[in-house]
C-alpha cells in the first residue's frame, strides 16, 4: 500500500485495511485491546467483531459476537484486557469475557436499566467500575463483583439532552460526560453519592467525544460545531478551564478524538472524511497546540472513530461510513 501523506516532519502511511460487507458497512466505533494486537469494532448490525493479524501479518476478522437485538454503538476493553463491553441501541450493555490465551469469548453479563439507546460505555482505570450513558439523559455507574455480576451504584441525571460520551480519568475515580446539551460534566463520589462537581461550557452544539492526556490534567473535546477545545485543570481554583481552541479546521462535524499516552499527539476524525493530528506547540508554550498533519479523504465517507494503539508508538486505527477499518502509522522523519 502506497497511500502516504507527507509534510516536512511527518508521513502518514496506510499499513492495512479491512472492509465490512454491505449493507452493514457503517463502522461506528473501535477499541484496541490493551496488548495492542487485537481490535474490537461495532457497526450498523447487531455484532461486535474481533480483528487480529494472521501469521503473515495481515489483519482479518477472527470472531463475531452476537448478543444484542439492535446495533452496537460503542465498545470498550477493560484495562486488563479480560473483558469487553458493548453499548447498544437495544438499551443494554453486554459484557464478554476473553479466554486467557485464545480469541474466544463468553457472554457473561447483560446490563439493563436504561430506557433508551445506550450511547457509550467506559471502564475506570482499575477495571472495577463501568459507566454507561444513554439517550434517556442518565449516566449509570456499575461496580463489577467477583462473580462477574454488576451492581448499579448510582444513576445520575444532570444533562438536559442525550448523553453522547462517558470517559474515566486515567488516574482518579473521576468521570467526564458530554452531551447534546453542549456541556461537559465531571462526576465524583462524595460520601457515597456521585455528584456533578463541574460543568464546562464553550461548545456551540453537541459534543461527540472526549479524551484525557496521560496525566489527566488536560482534556480535549470535539463536536458538531467543528470545534476542538483544550481544557486544563486549574489546581488553585479546583476547576477545569479552556486554554486553547481550533475552529474551522474541519468543514463538517468532528466525531472522534484521542490523545496518545505514548507520544502526546492528538488525533481527530471528521464527517468531512479527514484525519487531523495535533501536538503541543513547544515546551515553552505547553498550553498552545498546532496542527502537524491533515489527511484528507482518509476514508471515502465520514470518519467515525480514530484510536491510538496503546502499546505501539504512532500506530492508530480508524473506521468510517465507507465500511473500512484502517491501520495507520504516523512516521516521524
From Swiss-Prot:
Gene Ontology cellular-component terms for this entry are:
cytosolic [4Fe-4S] assembly targeting complex
Q: Could you state one GO biological process linked to this protein?
A: iron-sulfur cluster assembly
TM regions (residue ranges)? none
Which InterPro entries does this chain map to?
Answer: CIAO1/Cia1 (IPR028608), G-protein_beta_WD-40_rep (IPR020472), WD40/YVTN_repeat-like_dom_sf (IPR015943), WD40_repeat_CS (IPR019775), WD40_repeat_dom_sf (IPR036322), WD40_rpt (IPR001680)
Q: Write down the Pfam families for this protein, in alphabetical order.
A: WD40
Q: Which domain of life is it from?
A: Eukaryota
> Is Repeat one of the keywords?
yes
Family membership = Belongs to the WD repeat CIA1 family.
- Recorded protein name is Probable cytosolic iron-sulfur protein assembly protein CIAO1 homolog
Q: Organism source for this protein?
A: Dictyostelium discoideum (Social amoeba)
Designated gene of the protein:
ciao1
Amino acid at each position: 500500500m502506497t497511500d502516504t501523506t507527507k509534510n516536512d516532519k511527518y508521513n502518514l502511511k496506510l499499513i492495512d485495511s479491512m472492509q465490512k460487507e454491505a449493507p452493514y458497512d457503517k463502522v461506528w466505533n473501535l477499541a484496541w485491546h490493551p496488548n495492542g494486537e487485537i481490535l474490537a469494532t461495532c457497526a450498523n448490525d447487531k455484532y461486535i467483531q474481533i480483528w487480529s493479524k494472521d501469521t503473515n501479518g495481515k489483519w482479518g476478522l477472527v470472531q463475531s459476537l452476537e448478543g444484542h437485538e439492535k446495533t452496537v454503538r460503542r465498545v470498550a476493553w477493560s484495562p486488563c484486557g479480560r473483558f469487553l463491553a458493548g453499548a447498544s441501541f437495544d438499551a443494554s450493555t453486554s459484557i464478554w469475557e476473553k479466554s486467557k490465551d485464545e480469541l474466544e469469548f463468553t457472554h457473561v453479563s447483560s446490563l439493563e436499566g436504561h430506557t433508551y439507546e445506550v450511547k457509550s460505555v467506559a471502564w475506570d482505570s482499575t477495571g472495577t467500575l463501568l459507566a454507561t450513558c444513554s439517550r434517556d439523559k442518565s449516566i449509570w455507574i456499575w461496580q463489577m463483583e467477583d462473580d462477574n455480576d454488576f451492581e448499579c451504584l448510582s444513576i445520575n441525571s444532570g444533562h438536559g439532552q442525550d448523553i453522547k460520551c462517558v470517559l474515566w480519568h486515567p488516574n482518579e475515580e473521576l468521570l467526564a460526560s458530554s452531551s447534546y446539551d453542549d456541556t461537559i460534566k465531571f462526576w465524583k463520589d462524595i460520601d457515597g453519592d456521585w455528584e456533578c462537581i463541574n460543568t464546562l461550557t464553550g461548545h456551540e452544539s453537541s459534543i461527540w467525544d472526549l479524551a484525557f492526556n496521560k496525566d489527566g490534567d488536560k482534556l480535549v473535546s470535539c463536536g458538531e460545531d467543528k470545534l476542538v477545545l483544550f481544557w486544563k485543570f486549574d489546581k488553585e481554583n479546583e476547576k477545569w478551564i479552556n486554554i486553547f481552541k481550533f475552529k474551522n479546521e474541519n468543514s463538517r462535524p468532528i466525531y472522534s478524538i484521542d490523545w496518545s499516552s505514548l507520544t502526546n499527539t492528538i488525533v481527530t476524525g471528521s464527517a468531512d472524511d479527514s484525519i487531523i493530528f495535533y501536538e503541543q506547540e513547544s515546551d515553552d508554550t505547553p498550553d498552545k497546540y498546532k496542527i502537524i498533519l491533515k489527511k484528507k479523504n482518509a476514508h471515502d465517507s465520514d470518519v467515525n472513530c480514530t484510536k491510538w494503539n496503546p502499546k505501539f508508538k504512532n500506530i492508530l486505527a480508524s473506521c468510517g461510513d465507507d465500511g473500512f477499518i484502517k491501520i495507520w502509522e504516523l512516521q516521524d522523519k
